[in-house]
Amino acid sequence: MNHQRVVVLGAGVTGKSAAEFLHKKGDFVIGIDGSWDALISCNFFHQRYLDKTENFPEDVDLFVRSPGIKTSHPLVIEAKRRDIPIVTDVQLAFQSPEFYQYPSLGITGSTGKTTTVLFLVHLLHSLGISAFAMGNIGFPILQAMYQKGVRVVEISSFQLTEQEQKIPVLSGAAILNISENHLDYHQTLHAYSEAKMNIAKCLQWPDSLWSGEGVSSGRSYLEYTEEIDSVLDKGGALKPLYLHDRNNYCAAYALAKEVTSVPLEAFLQAVQTFEKPPHRIEYLGEKDGVRYINDSKATTMSSVEKALMAVKENVIVIMGGRNKESNFTSLIPVLTQTVKHIVAMGECRKEIAQALSSSLPLTQARDLQEAVSIAQSIAQPGDVILLSPGCASFDQFRSFEERGDCFRQLVGDMEALKI
């Protein structure tokens, strides 16, 4: 076996999974991270360096970039200058013989990835097929790929950026949608879109690419809308569904059909028994005639727009956090149709105010706690208080999950909600 000297840049969850995978292959693994504590917490690094350009090792055969690290990072640029192949954990997995033992399905897109992945796994389970979610969903692909069953992989644009060569491994793939997102990382919408489209290079068959809103390539999974709507309507499951959820389920249906037959009755049962993950237009309850909805996962303008169109009217929306180079003015048309007041919070509250205060009533808040208090002081019976930030959470929280949990806790500090 030809053992390599491999740099792993980033010692987070994904980087550690890559280090373990490479170590077991017999490679010499060199870890680089800005935190020495993170480096020494991983036993699979043979050498460790702090994140400095002068620490770039000699005689490196392969460079593994953790997905959260930008391609503009000085060490990534240095690896390119030295003509060292650069990959992410997804490319490592897709090139591994272990990954070919079972069918695999890939899902990417700007919004809806996690819900679609989890529903697809749920649908396959309901059909008696073993299936596992992995990838960007929180289960590192290099660890989860050893499980026996269909691999349903959530893939982010960060993981697809380095996908330059064709690796025909996926039985089917879906690009759910493409809208402005992660411009702080990709710089342009074109570069972001190109990264998403790279999933097509991983398909065994070109006609197994399914696409949705804003995607020009592939077959539209919405071609199944009519038959799906018909069975959902008959089963009483259509009316309670938000449009974007129905579309996500359509995508899952199309992908499931790439590996098995899917009776519509079984699809209906899967929809009826599926529990959506939290923080995604999650209805928390009602008190004094005011409804509360947690959409902390909304970190893009398109996500906020979908939430507003789902809730439709009398909305007091809480927005803000760390800006991802988003254009807040793009929301003005939908905001003026649905929102009665904006509460702008956190690090970019002034940017939001500058963009939107001339179009709608707007109040600024330092943090989420103050934002909830302001929203409650404004709300009247029949209103909806919607947390749909349209921004990253990292100004105040470690994750969108922590932000959503905080919102739920702040709401829970009141009397018990009527669900």
Swiss-Prot record:
SUPFAM superfamilies: MurCD N-terminal domain, MurD-like peptide ligases, catalytic domain, MurD-like peptide ligases, peptide-binding domain. It holds the Pfam family Mur_ligase_M. The keyword Cell cycle applies. GO terms for cellular component: cytoplasm. One of its GO terms (biological process) is cell wall organization. GO terms for molecular function: ATP binding; UDP-N-acetylmuramoylalanine-D-glutamate ligase activity. It is an enzyme of class 6 (ligase). Its EC number is 6.3.2.9. NCBIfam families: murD (TIGR01087). Belongs to the MurCDEF family. This is UDP-N-acetylmuramoylalanine--D-glutamate ligase. It comes from Chlamydia felis (strain Fe/C-56).
